[in-house]
Amino acid sequence: MHCPFCSTEETKVIDSRLVSEGYQVRRRRECGNCHERFTTFETAELIIPKVIKNDGTREPFNEEKLRRGIQHALEKRPVSENDVEKAISYIIHRLRSTGEREVPSKLVGTLVMEELKKLDKVAYIRFASVYLSFDDINQFSKEIEKLRD
């Protein structure tokens, strides 16, 4: 690896540790030329499948779009940012673990609803009302009854 200070290729790893719950390796490196130390992070390159939308079009998975949708449902709800990030990471993990190159948008929506149901029931109903296209109050009532069971 090139030294970020002097650009020489002569660097060595002096310490390695697992971080991010074992999904990343943190390495301390030292340059053999200028003796500066620097840190690198190594992660496995895992491909997130493309999303097949309801109209049949395909688009790359968009983590920001996922985050915005979840945050919008959780607006003014008592859920920590850390819990939101854990939910997003779990959804991405589930998508990767399908082993598929493409997944239907319905799967993404279902995973979001599962996570919101765990985080906050009100946010779940908010998201479900849009995602499932509730037309009237009866659909809200039915979904709320399902939560009570």
Curated annotation (Swiss-Prot):
Span of domain ATP-cone: 49-139
Zinc finger map (unnamed): 3-34
Alphabetized UniProt keyword annotations: ATP-binding, DNA-binding, Metal-binding, Nucleotide-binding, Repressor, Transcription, Transcription regulation, Zinc, Zinc-finger
Cited PROSITE patterns: ATP_CONE
GO terms for MF: ATP binding; DNA binding; zinc ion binding
InterPro entries, sorted: ATP-cone_dom, NrdR-like_N, RNR_NrdR-like
Species per Swiss-Prot/TrEMBL record: Pasteurella multocida (strain Pm70)
Bound cofactor: record note: Binds 1 zinc ion.
One Pfam family in the UniProt entry: Zn_ribbon_NrdR
One GO BP: negative regulation of DNA-templated transcription
Family note: Belongs to the NrdR family.
Protein's name in the database: Transcriptional repressor NrdR
Cited PANTHER family: TRANSCRIPTIONAL REPRESSOR NRDR
Cofactor(s) this protein cannot do without: Zn(2+)
Domain of life, per lineage: Bacteria
Main function: Negatively regulates transcription of bacterial ribonucleotide reductase nrd genes and operons by binding to NrdR-boxes.
